[in-house]
Curated annotation (Swiss-Prot):
Note: The basic functional RuBisCO is composed of a large chain homodimer in a 'head-to-tail' conformation. In form I RuBisCO this homodimer is arranged in a barrel-like tetramer with the small subunits forming a tetrameric 'cap' on each end of the 'barrel'.
Homology family: Belongs to the RuBisCO small chain family.
FT transit peptide: 1-41
Job of this protein: RuBisCO catalyzes two reactions: the carboxylation of D-ribulose 1,5-bisphosphate, the primary event in carbon dioxide fixation, as well as the oxidative fragmentation of the pentose substrate. Both reactions occur simultaneously and in competition at the same active site. Although the small subunit is not catalytic it is essential for maximal activity.
GO cellular component: chloroplast
Gene3D superfamilies (UniProt xref): Ribulose bisphosphate carboxylase, small subunit
Lineage: Eukaryota, Viridiplantae, Chlorophyta, Ulvophyceae, TCBD clade
Pfam families: RuBisCO_small
The protein's name in its UniProt record: Ribulose bisphosphate carboxylase small subunit, chloroplastic 4
Localisation: Plastid, Chloroplast
Subunit and partners: Heterohexadecamer of 8 large and 8 small subunits.
GO molecular function list: ribulose-bisphosphate carboxylase activity
GO terms of biological process kind: photorespiration; reductive pentose-phosphate cycle
HAMAP family referenced in this protein's UniProt entry, alphabetically: RuBisCO_S_bact
């Protein structure tokens, strides 16, 4: 290596080892309470009793027909297949009594419980009103059952989403969003 090249590499290495400018640290005088999103000054405690949830959207108030129809439009826009399922109140939540177990091996379907399918999957469905009429028919047939809408992707052969569309009037395991915190 020539002397000129060595001098050049020494100069380059000195430039690379220069310390970076230290950023100025800014401290805030605000307390944690002033940064809470809901503008509350107190932390809330989640109500642990009678506050069960189901899949997607269960933290929201019950969906209206218009909101369900919009979700169906989204499902159809993604080429997924909507399907209705229902379950009695005592079979709706996961538990040892209603989980299907085959010896020490458990089924690979979600949480090892199956809901009953309402008719067949809606392969030919083109809009939300068709699903809403099926929800109404299922509700009329089983008024004291939980009903959920699930959607399947035929290409990936998986369930994509599922959400509750009907909660029985006799259900006592649910709280409105305003009552979920202590």
């Amino acid at each position: 290596m020539s002397a000129a090249m060595m001098n050049k590499s020494v100069v380059l290495s000195k430039q690379c080892t220069k310390p970076a400018a230290t950023p100025k640290v800014v401290t805030s005088k605000r307390s944690f309470a002033s940064t809470v999103a809901n503008k509350n000054r107190e932390m809330m405690v989640w109500q642990p009793f009678n506050n069960k949830m189901f899949e997607t959207f269960s933290f929201l108030p019950p969906l209206t027909d218009e909101q369900i129809s919009k979700q169906v439009d989204y499902i159809l826009a993604n080429s997924w297949t909507p399907c209705l399922e229902f379950a009695a109140s005592d079979q709706a939540y996961a538990g040892n009594e209603n989980c299907i177990r085959m010896g020490p091996v458990a089924s690979t379907y979600q949480d090892n419980r199956y809901w009953t399918m309402w008719k067949l999957p809606m392969f030919g469905c083109t809009d939300g009103s068709q699903v809403l009429s099926e929800i109404q028919a299922c509700t009329n047939a089983f008024p004291d059952a939980y009903i959920r809408l699930v959607c399947f992707d035929a290409n990936r052969q998986v369930q994509i989403s599922g959400f509750l569309v009907h909660r029985p009037p006799s259900a006592t395991d649910y709280r409105l969003p305003a009552d979920r915190q202590v």
